């Protein structure tokens, strides 16, 4: 099972239908990847994601989505090992996904598809990053984007 919390930071909350769409996207991706755990999705404005992108990635501009995986130790952090028998006592906190709502609107218009489709795409994209997928090479990109499309097609968010 996947536990999802949706937060709004410095923006008006999105409606309940869109929140349910995000949960459906994450549940479908978790099922495809056979993973359980907890995810927090925070919806923000361009100023906030710009700040986070600058502070954590050293990129001084807004972006569409950021992912902060909790299962990967950060620079200078110790890796924590838990006995397999005890692991079930702790929640599997997968991480945080931060999405710029204004960027999602802008990109939906640029790509000629719905805001819902773009928001779903960014949600699944961020989730796959939490699981370690990347798109730094053509092979990685092909793998990641094919998984994204599979999830989006499954829930009816086609182009």
From Swiss-Prot:
EC numbers, comma separated: 3.1.-.-
Cofactor requirement: Zn(2+)
Binding residues for Zn(2+): 125, 129, 135
Principal place of residence: cytoplasm
GO cellular-component term (any): cytoplasm
Enzyme class: hydrolase
Cellular location(s): Cytoplasm
Transmembrane intervals: none
Keywords, ordered alphabetically: Cytoplasm, Endonuclease, Hydrolase, Metal-binding, Nuclease, Ribosome biogenesis, rRNA processing, Zinc
Protein's GO biological process: rRNA processing
Note accompanying the cofactor annotation: Binds 1 zinc ion.
Pfam (any one): YbeY
Record has Zinc as a keyword: yes
Single GO molecular function: metalloendopeptidase activity
Role: Single strand-specific metallo-endoribonuclease involved in late-stage 70S ribosome quality control and in maturation of the 3' terminus of the 16S rRNA.
NCBIfam families documented for this protein: rRNA maturation RNase YbeY
Family: Belongs to the endoribonuclease YbeY family.
Protein name: Endoribonuclease YbeY
Native organism: Brevibacillus brevis (strain 47 / JCM 6285 / NBRC 100599)
Gene it is expressed from: ybeY
């Amino acid at each position: 099972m996947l536990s999802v919390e949706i937060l709004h930071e410095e923006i008006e909350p999105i409606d309940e239908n869109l929140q349910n769409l995000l949960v459906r996207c994450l549940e479908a991706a978790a099922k495809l990847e056979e993973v359980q755990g907890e995810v927090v999705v925070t919806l923000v404005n361009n100023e906030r994601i710009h700040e986070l992108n600058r502070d954590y990635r050293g990129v001084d501009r807004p972006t569409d989505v950021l992912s902060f995986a909790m299962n990967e130790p950060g620079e200078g952090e110790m890796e924590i090992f838990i006995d397999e028998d005890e692991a079930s006592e702790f929640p599997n906190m997968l991480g945080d996904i931060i999405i710029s709502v204004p960027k999602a609107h802008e990109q939906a218009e640029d790509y000629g598809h719905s805001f819902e489709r773009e928001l779903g795409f960014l949600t699944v994209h961020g989730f796959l990053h939490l699981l370690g997928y990347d798109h730094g090479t053509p092979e990685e990109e092909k793998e990641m984007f094919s998984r994204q499309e599979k999830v989006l097609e499954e829930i009816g968010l086609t182009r």
